[in-house]
């Protein structure tokens, strides 16, 4: 990587605050504008970095440290409470096992749906489908409902999809899941 390589992620002062209520009644009062007794819990506070093309970033920490929260913010599946996040180019993610796959649809149908979700035209997905299926090593199982798949099969299909679309940023939460399920 050279210093001139463009940034694919820019994060400045990023934070995520959750509002915690002691009871459902307190939450309802807040929604109705009657009283707000919520406590604030900052899962992340003042996170800043840049990631450039060709770089890798590992996020490690104790349980509850905010690792998954950060990755969800970067992927765009969660909104920040504070700060700025700029994504340049396509960002794809594997955040939870099978997230985004409909269990009653076949693997092939899920590929088409997921492709449209990440902004690929149907023709592009049709062109990529065979190579994704081959890389996933699912064979004929790709035409069965995803609910019949083992967790390893789901992970292989998701990984084959997100790598085939050649994203500028690939986000994977709990990478050990991918390696233990596929080896």
Describe each model-derived feature in a short phrase.
Residues 60-62:
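The feature captures the beta-strand-to-loop junction immediately N-terminal to the Walker
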Residues 28-31, 92, 112, 124-141:
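Conserved ABC ATPase "signature" region
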